[in-house]
Amino acid sequence: MRLLLILLLLTPVILAGSLDEEPNNADGANAASFTADQEGRHKRSLDVVLKEDGCPKYCSSDSDCCIRDRCLYIPQTGKQECMYKGPFL
């Protein structure tokens, strides 16, 4: 039930993001910049360290973590990590 609610809430955001992209010009300028943007996102995604469950290990906010994880500062490492916060929240 929660998953359905999350999907319903995210659908307008996903659609809005796809509609914001500009169409390509005849000279291909937008196509080149879009490709560069995709390349930057791909490089960032390769830098993400994942835990065994496939969720990100490090974070800067709760939105960087999986749904049941929370972004917490770990004094021993000096970094913020996504930590499991439990099934009932």
Swiss-Prot record:
GO-annotated cellular components: extracellular region
Keyword tags: Cleavage on pair of basic residues, Disulfide bond, Secreted, Signal, Toxin
Keyword Membrane applies: no
Location(s), subcellular: Secreted
PTM info: Contains 3 disulfide bonds.
Residues that make up the propeptide removed upon maturation: 22-44
Signal sequence residues: 1-21
Location of the region described as Disordered in the Swiss-Prot/TrEMBL record: 22-42
Tissue specificity remark: Expressed by the venom duct.
One Gene Ontology MF term: toxin activity
Keyword Ribosomal protein among UniProt keywords: no
Comment text on domains: The cysteine framework is VI/VII (C-C-CC-C-C). Has the PXY motif between the first and the second Cys residues.
Name of the protein: Teretoxin Tan6.8
